[in-house]
Regions:
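Short, surface-exposed interaction patches in beta-rich subdomains
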Residues: 183, 194-282
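Non-cytosolic head/periplasmic domains of membrane-anchored proteins
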Residues: 119-208
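Hydrophobic membrane-insertion alpha-helices, especially the h-region
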Residues: 30-53
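Short linear S-[DN]-x-LW-Φ motif typified by the pepsin-like aspartic protease active-site region
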Residues: 3-4, 54-119, 136-140, 146, ...
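A generic beta-sheet turn/junction motif
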Residues: 80-82, 91, 115-117, 151, ...
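Short, surface-exposed beta-strand-loop junctions and turns on beta-sheet-rich folds
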Residues: 93-95, 105, 128-129, 220, ...
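General beta-strand recognition
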Residues: 86, 97, 119-121, 157, ...
Length: 282
């Protein structure tokens, strides 16, 4: 009686786990990590939302109205983190009036006014969790007082000032009118609009925005630049000629004014991406 023939054992399936395959428990651990990470993110989102809601509920607004003897002030300096600033020159004013509107949320807005060595210094600073922080400032002053204004996030407006004017904003427009003497206007992200200028020297520049300058009297020197935007100058139609320099990487140039390379009146215009126009009133 012959022995039965035994078939060889079947070959391992290619789909079966090999000894080198990672244990199944690692998949569970990975899933746990994702669950924990998602839970943390959800908790953070809930905390952030709760803080925003608490900040909104805690929002408060207050106003101030203060006056200072103009004879004791030789300059005005304003610096605000968030908030529009307006300065208006008034003939015959013997007081400098400062009106402010201060808004705060979960944390207080640090707002202060003080006189230091003849300089009226106004500050509006935002702290942590200061989503609702804002310091709006309106000033009425004699026209001959020099002003320096810095705002991180909002517009600046100055009118009818004959002293030196220096304005800077990170994110906001600058609008001025009827200024004279030396003027500097600078914005990182915003337009610069100036009208009825009698400034002897003016520098205006923006990273992203339009520069538009309209003069009521011939300037001595103008430097106007925009990295991304058009630049336009409108000059009074008088016999004066100008030493003109224009430069744009991507844009057209229209320079329909009287020019003279030996003139002591200088205009420099440039734009990275934008048109340059210098003309007389139409």
């Amino acid at each position: 009686m012959s022995s039965p023939t035994l078939s060889p054992p079947p070959s391992p399936s290619p789909w079966m786990d090999s000894p080198s395959d990672p244990p199944v428990r690692r998949t569970s651990r990975t899933r746990s990590v994702w669950v924990i990470g998602g839970s943390i993110l959800t908790a953070l989102a809930l905390i952030f939302g709760a803080l925003q809601a608490a900040s909104a509920l805690a929002t408060d607004t207050r106003t101030t109205d203060q006056s200072f003897d103009a004879g004791e002030i030789n300059a005005i300096e304003i610096s605000v983190d968030n908030g529009a600033v307006v300065i208006d020159g008034r003939e015959g004013a013997d007081q400098i009036r400062v009106q402010s509107r201060i808004r705060e949320g979960l944390t207080s807005t640090d707002f202060s006014l003080r006189v230091t060595n003849g300089r009226l210094v106004i500050r509006g600073e935002c702290g942590w969790l200061s989503e609702w922080c804002e310091s709006r400032v309106n000033v009425i002053a004699p026209p001959n007082v020099p002003v320096v204004v810095t705002s991180d996030n909002d517009d600046i407006t100055v009118r009818r000032m004959r002293g030196g004017v220096d304005l800077t904003t990170e994110n906001g427009d600058i609008a001025v009118g009827r200024l004279s003497q030396r003027v500097r206007l600078q914005s990182e992200n915003g337009d610069i609009i100036a009208k009825q200028l009698a400034a002897s020297t003016l520098r205006a520049g923006t990273e992203n925005g339009t520069v538009s300058l309209v003069f009521s009297s011939p300037p001595g020197r103008v430097d106007a630049t925009s990295e991304n935007g058009d630049v336009e100058l409108v000059l009074p139609d008088t016999p004066e000629a100008y030493r003109l320099s224009t430069n744009t990487d991507n844009g057209a140039v229209d320079d329909s004014i009287r020019t003279d390379p030996s003139s002591n009146r200088t205009i420099n215009m440039s734009s990275g991406n934008g048109d340059l126009t210098v003309r007389y009133p139409s």
